[in-house]
């Protein structure tokens, strides 16, 4: 088993980190750059920043936040939200981000995945897939979970891999923010359908849930927000738990 990555997720709105349940009822969790520094010290393997209103409100990411974060942390970080063009990607990567995450724009213009991979390399391109269960399958949503696409999540995952995505960030909207555990059935279905790494997102409430995502869901990395922001568990506590259950993690 390859080393598994633990990734705190920072949902950003109006320059602040927020968290809600099922993509609603957002509450303030702090300054993104300060939180990034904190998680770097805590032993996080990577960070993901998602500007959760950028796509819906048709506005680009604040480059200033990217530059400040790049100057403050030593771990890789991904930026998503409002990225619609190759020039958007270039601006964010040039400002210091290691990867860009695209979601709504990838569905509307799948060629953006292929072009981004060609220009910057697949390792820089993460495709985020937000989905809900429907009639025994999973349906893809865009625009921050507000717009249903009719796409099947597993088929879409295979398509983004074919187009050149380097990773998939897979969020169960049903589980998001509930702290009841990841949708391991969804994770396993997508992980077995593609060769590229799948990052589990949505539902972490305790270290056991991250273990389930890795073992049952076959995830390559696990992303969590509430349990870390609220200091229910620290990154190091989660890593110690996973290591104690035979899962390889980076311990400093």
Swiss-Prot record:
An MF annotation (GO) of this entry: lyase activity
Biological-process GO terms, alphabetical: L-histidine biosynthetic process
Top-level EC class as recorded in UniProt: lyase
Any Pfam family hit: His_biosynth
Enzyme Commission no: 4.3.2.10
Residues of the active site: 11, 130
Matching InterPro entries: Aldolase_TIM (IPR013785), His_biosynth (IPR006062), HisF (IPR004651), IGPS_HisA/HisF (IPR050064), RibuloseP-bd_barrel (IPR011060)
Keyword Lyase: yes
GO CC terms, sorted: cytoplasm
Pathway connected to this protein: Amino-acid biosynthesis; L-histidine biosynthesis; L-histidine from 5-phospho-alpha-D-ribose 1-diphosphate: step 5/9
Compartments, as annotated in UniProt: Cytoplasm
Catalytic activity: 5-[(5-phospho-1-deoxy-D-ribulos-1-ylimino)methylamino]-1-(5-phospho-beta-D-ribosyl)imidazole-4-carboxamide + L-glutamine = D-erythro-1-(imidazol-4-yl)glycerol 3-phosphate + 5-amino-1-(5-phospho-beta-D-ribosyl)imidazole-4-carboxamide + L-glutamate + H(+)
UniProt keywords, alphabetically: Amino-acid biosynthesis, Cytoplasm, Histidine biosynthesis, Lyase
Function: IGPS catalyzes the conversion of PRFAR and glutamine to IGP, AICAR and glutamate. The HisF subunit catalyzes the cyclization activity that produces IGP and AICAR from PRFAR using the ammonia provided by the HisH subunit.
NCBIfam families to which the protein is assigned, alphabetical: hisF (TIGR00735)
Subunit structure: Heterodimer of HisH and HisF.
Family under the similarity heading: Belongs to the HisA/HisF family.
PANTHER family: IMIDAZOLE GLYCEROL PHOSPHATE SYNTHASE HISHF, IMIDAZOLE GLYCEROL PHOSPHATE SYNTHASE SUBUNIT HISF/H IGP SYNTHASE SUBUNIT HISF/H
Stated name of the protein: Imidazole glycerol phosphate synthase subunit HisF
């Amino acid at each position: 088993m390859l080393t598994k990555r633990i990734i705190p997720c920072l949902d950003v709105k109006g320059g602040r980190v927020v968290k809600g349940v099922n993509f609603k009822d957002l509450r303030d969790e702090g300054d993104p750059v300060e939180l990034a520094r904190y998680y770097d010290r805590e032993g996080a393997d990577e960070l993901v920043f998602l500007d959760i209103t950028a796509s819906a409100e048709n506005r680009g990411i604040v480059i200033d936040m990217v530059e400040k974060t790049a100057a403050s942390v030593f771990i890789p970080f991904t930026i998503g939200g409002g990225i619609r063009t190759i020039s958007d990607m270039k601006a964010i990567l040039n400002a210091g981000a290691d990867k860009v995450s695209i979601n709504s724009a990838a569905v509307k213009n799948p060629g953006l995945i292929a072009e981004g991979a060609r220009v910057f390399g697949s390792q820089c391109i993460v495709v985020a897939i937000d989905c809900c269960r429907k009639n025994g399958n999973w349906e893809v949503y865009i625009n921050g979970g507000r717009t249903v696409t009719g796409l099947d999540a597993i088929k879409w995952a295979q398509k983004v891999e074919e187009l050149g995505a380097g990773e998939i960030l897979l969020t169960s909207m049903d589980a998001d923010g509930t702290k009841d555990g990841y949708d391991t059935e969804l994770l396993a279905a997508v992980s077995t359908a593609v060769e590229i790494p799948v990052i589990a997102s949505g539902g972490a409430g305790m270290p056991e849930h991250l273990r389930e995502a890795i073992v049952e869901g076959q995830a390559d990395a696990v992303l969590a927000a509430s349990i870390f922001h609220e200091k229910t568990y620290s990154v190091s506590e989660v890593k110690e738990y996973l290591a104690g259950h035979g899962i390889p993690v980076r311990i400093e």
